[in-house]
Amino acid sequence: MSDILDKIVATKKIEVAHNSSKISLGNHREQAEANNQSNLLKPRGFIQAIERKISAGKAGVITEVKKASPSKGILRENFISAEIAQSYEKHGAACLSVLTDSDYFQGCNAYLQEARAACQIPVLRKDFTIDPYQIYEARAIGADAILLIVACLELNQMMELEACAHELGLDVLVEVHNAPELEQALELKTPLLGINNRNLKTFEVSLQTTLSLLSSVPKNKTLVTESGILSRADVELMRKNQINAFLVGEAFMRAPDPGTALSELFA
């Protein structure tokens, strides 16, 4: 694990202990089960939404709702998650990815709830999931999918967390950065596989990360390239290599209107 991931995971363990002393796992489970019976809050089908776009010949874009990052600081001063969500939906996003980590990304659960309430597209809870408590919490706040980062987890942990997510109707995006992590990710059932082009040790970004791992990704997986997609040329490079799902954040967060930036990048 990288230094920054070590710090984040250590913080996350403290956060989970603190949160579970305030709201029990049982309470989150009850809310999650109630949400699953609610027309407004039942899962919207995160993977399906991406695959629908791809089947229609379009890019399946997961658009990020992110106020700040450890490497870049504040990305967007005028940050209203509901408005950002509506702008993305209007301009053709498949899904949203909402940062809920407070210590490193200045996110919160309310941003996810506000974004989801403002649109009809599915929402990924973008956080550092290390404990089943967070998965019940994710469904309780209305998330449609969760993220599992291989660099943060042992294989047996990932399998337990994935099973918990699927039991609640949540889709899972599993994220890797290198070949050993990819090998572990392929042990999971989820068809949704993200390759992060950002090295979490150095924060350097290279699109070659996705391209170099491409031949090892089975055809039955939906591959999402994450980070570093900043230009039309980047999009065209990926689509030329039959990569049609993208997770994009920073490029949109810095734009005056995130949705307009989305439609320009994926025109």
Swiss-Prot record:
<keyword id="KW-0210">Decarboxylase</keyword>
<protein>
    <recommendedName>
        <fullName>Indole-3-glycerol phosphate synthase</fullName>
        <ecNumber>4.1.1.48</ecNumber>
    </recommendedName>
</protein>
<keyword id="KW-0057">Aromatic amino acid biosynthesis</keyword>
<dbReference type="InterPro" id="IPR001468">
    <property type="entry name" value="Indole-3-GlycerolPSynthase_CS"/>
</dbReference>
<dbReference type="GO" id="GO:0004640">
    <property type="term" value="F:phosphoribosylanthranilate isomerase activity"/>
</dbReference>
<dbReference type="GO" id="GO:0004425">
    <property type="term" value="F:indole-3-glycerol-phosphate synthase activity"/>
</dbReference>
<dbReference type="InterPro" id="IPR013785">
    <property type="entry name" value="Aldolase_TIM"/>
</dbReference>
<keyword id="KW-0028">Amino-acid biosynthesis</keyword>
<comment type="similarity">
    <text>Belongs to the TrpC family.</text>
</comment>
<dbReference type="InterPro" id="IPR045186">
    <property type="entry name" value="Indole-3-glycerol_P_synth"/>
</dbReference>
<dbReference type="Pfam" id="PF00218">
    <property type="entry name" value="IGPS"/>
</dbReference>
<keyword id="KW-0822">Tryptophan biosynthesis</keyword>
<dbReference type="GO" id="GO:0000162">
    <property type="term" value="P:L-tryptophan biosynthetic process"/>
</dbReference>
<dbReference type="InterPro" id="IPR011060">
    <property type="entry name" value="RibuloseP-bd_barrel"/>
</dbReference>
<comment type="pathway">
    <text>Amino-acid biosynthesis; L-tryptophan biosynthesis; L-tryptophan from chorismate: step 4/5.</text>
</comment>
<dbReference type="InterPro" id="IPR013798">
    <property type="entry name" value="Indole-3-glycerol_P_synth_dom"/>
</dbReference>
<keyword id="KW-0456">Lyase</keyword>
